[in-house]
Amino acid sequence: NIYTLKYEGKLKPSSELKLHCQIYKTKPEIGAVIHTHQMFGSIVAAAQVDVQVLDENHQNILGGKVIKAAPYALPNTKKITMATAKAIENSNAALMSNHGVVCIGKDLEHVFDVARTLEKACELFIESKKAIA
């Protein structure tokens, strides 16, 4: 239950349960949330910068031209939960500074597509920064 944080069954929910529930509350139209530690997404998250999405197809899948980085906060805290929910307000993904990424979608297939696309967008973003350095 996203309001009481109570669950049924034998499997224990993720330690980021509050984060997942807050995103579902904030964006009731979605059907799936995933939190990953994918390589390029985590690199950009460690840099604590927003990702400029350079490819138009990536922009369509990610729901915007910029993927926001939530300010750093300790994992499993209200601060990181609220900061990440705010960072994902206008797109289908957000970076969790020094931690990883969160992606949302209408269903699991869609959210995995968002995660794959975010990884490609982060790789392109890193390459673009290297090219001008």
Regions found by a protein language model. Name each.
Residues N1-A133:
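Glycine-rich flexible loops
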